[in-house]
From Swiss-Prot:
Organism for this UniProt entry: Rhodococcus opacus (strain B4)
PANTHER family membership: DIMETHYLADENOSINE TRANSFERASE, DIMETHYLADENOSINE TRANSFERASE-RELATED
Family annotation (SMART domains): rADc
Membrane-spanning ranges: none
GO terms assigned for molecular function: 16S rRNA (adenine(1518)-N(6)/adenine(1519)-N(6))-dimethyltransferase activity; RNA binding
Family: Belongs to the class I-like SAM-binding methyltransferase superfamily. rRNA adenine N(6)-methyltransferase family. RsmA subfamily.
Catalytic activity: adenosine(1518)/adenosine(1519) in 16S rRNA + 4 S-adenosyl-L-methionine = N(6)-dimethyladenosine(1518)/N(6)-dimethyladenosine(1519) in 16S rRNA + 4 S-adenosyl-L-homocysteine + 4 H(+)
Keyword Transferase assigned: yes
Function of the molecule: Specifically dimethylates two adjacent adenosines (A1518 and A1519) in the loop of a conserved hairpin near the 3'-end of 16S rRNA in the 30S particle. May play a critical role in biogenesis of 30S subunits.
Matching HAMAP family: 16SrRNA_methyltr_A
SUPFAM superfamilies associated with the record: S-adenosyl-L-methionine-dependent methyltransferases (SSF53335)
Signal peptide annotation: none
Protein name: Ribosomal RNA small subunit methyltransferase A
Subcellular location: Cytoplasm
Length: 296
């Protein structure tokens, strides 16, 4: 038998999932995708290979995967990285994932650790080791909160490549001045450089979602241009939230509640070198950091 005829699992590689395998596993495990958990399972091997390649992860990486589901992306990651830590909120899927990996990638099974937890609330103490990269098909209904939470809680994360709803991907990667630039854009940029990294069609999912998907890459700043400790992050995020809560108003008016009064907001804006007549959508992350650092 030639190498081409030997099943991938027998060669120490993962046997990736296709449409038939995904449906068979779902039936075997009694899994019915739920909108509540934002579950849409990828069933295309080429798509998961592309995600892993775009993430740029390798043997030196410990990858954090959120919402591994039936294991499509997990198997592709195990082929190329040192370790995968999969965080799964669904207890049934969390229990079944090691079984799938043992069956389809027996030589790679020891690289997988499954954590049964809510990624939006998971604590560093629950994550074994220090993950260097986040690679995930994030549940669309909580994608941004999960992304920001993990970058806040896990300073070891150097990069992220996530699949999210296309509209969310556009907002995360938007630049100041854009109509879609907003809270997700600025907060993501607080941690690192953000860019769109590709598009993913609906046909590669089961069940087929009603929306298109997109890939977003975030590379954490190697040398942060501002303090990224929890206290400063909370201060900066509070200003961002206030500025966009009344998007159409000038910052002098929009930040009146945050600063105590419109007059005090104007004083602090001027101290930060920002025209009081500006609007939040024109400010980059650096401007919000300067504003948060002004003194009442």
């Amino acid at each position: 038998m030639s190498d081409a005829e030997v099943p991938p699992a027998a060669r120490g590689q993962a046997a990736l999932l296709g449409p038939a395998e995904v449906r068979a596993l779902a039936e075997e495990f009694g899994v019915r995708p739920t909108k509540q958990l934002g579950q849409n399972f990828v069933h295309d091997a080429n798509t998961v290979r592309r995600i892993v390649a775009t993430a740029g992860v390798g043997r030196e990486d410990t990858v954090l995967e959120v919402g591994p589901g039936l294991g499509s992306l997990t198997l592709a990651l195990l082929d190329v990285v040192d370790r995968v830590i999969a965080v799964e909120i669904d207890p049934n899927l969390a229990a079944r994932l090691p079984v799938t990996v043992a069956d389809r990638a027996p030589d790679l099974a020891d690289r997988l650790t499954v954590v049964g937890a809510d990624a939006m609330r998971v604590k560093p103490s629950e994550i074994p080791g220090e993950p260097t990269a986040l690679v995930a098909n994030l549940p669309y209904n909580v994608a941004v909160p999960v992304l920001l939470h993990l970058f806040s809680e896990l300073p070891s994360l150097r990069t992220a490549l996530v699949m999210v709803q296309a509209e969310v991907a556009d907002r995360l990667a938007a630049s100041p001045g854009s109509k879609i630039y907003g809270v997700p854009s600025v907060k993501a940029n607080f941690f690192g450089a953000v860019r769109r990294a590709g598009a993913v069609g609906r046909a590669v999912f089961w069940p087929v979602p009603k929306v298109e998907s997109g890939l977003v890459r975030i590379d954490r700043y190697a040398e942060p241009p501002w303090p990224v400790d929890d206290e400063n992050r909370r201060r900066v995020f509070a200003v961002i939230d206030a500025a966009f809560a009344q998007r159409r108003k000038t910052l002098r008016a929009a930040l009146g509640g945050w600063a105590g009064s419109p007059a005090e907001a104007e004083r602090r804006l001027l101290e930060a070198g920002i025209p009081p007549s500006s609007r939040g959508e024109t400010l980059d992350a650096a401007a919000f950091v300067r504003l948060a650092a002004t003194h009442p």
